[in-house]
Amino acid sequence: MKTMKKYIKTAFFCSMYWLIVQLNIANLGTRIPDKYFRQKYIIFKSFNFEKHGKFWNKWFYVRKWKHKILDGHQLNQNIYDQRHLMTINTDEIEKMIIETKRAELIHWISILPVIIFNKGSRLVKYINIFYAMIANVPIIIVQRYNRPRLTQLLRILKRRGERHD
């Protein structure tokens, strides 16, 4: 019984830790000015093996599950709400590309706090590493799948001269 209480207490504190840390990281991430995401940083580059996002769908079937991921805007009003996308124009697509970069960065950073569990028991470490990966890697994959497709759409719109609606 004493061991069960200890596990429940540990689970509660770990849950609260992740809730507070991830909400704060997301909140801070939304405050990063867009201009930093307009830069061409290597972390956001689509690598050759990704084949413009096709890799992610081929190996992880992204199209089948990406719509099931909770929209961050429901938890944080500062997060871009893509449901309000009324027109497809270069400004909106550029904003969406910026937001894929922001989301990817936020979720990479959200994995790092797992370090705090380094001194914990093996079970606590494994559970928290598993949680950090399962909560963040799928969102990173979706961003890496969507961004090259949005970039290609942006190129097409610019070629057609559809600057603004």
UniProtKB/Swiss-Prot annotation:
GO terms for cellular component: plasma membrane
The keyword Cell membrane is assigned to this record: yes
Location of this chain's protein in the cell: Cell membrane
Transmembrane segments: 126-145
Gene Ontology annotations of biological process type: carotenoid biosynthetic process
Record protein name field: Glycosyl-4,4'-diaponeurosporenoate acyltransferase
Cleaved signal peptide residues: 1-28
Function comment: Catalyzes the acylation of glycosyl-4,4'-diaponeurosporenoate, i.e. the esterification of glucose at the C6'' position with the carboxyl group of the C(15) fatty acid 12-methyltetradecanoic acid, to yield staphyloxanthin. This is the last step in the biosynthesis of this orange pigment, present in most staphylococci strains.
Family: Belongs to the acyltransferase CrtO family.
Membrane topology: Single-pass membrane protein
Single GO MF annotation: acyltransferase activity
EC nos: 2.3.1.-
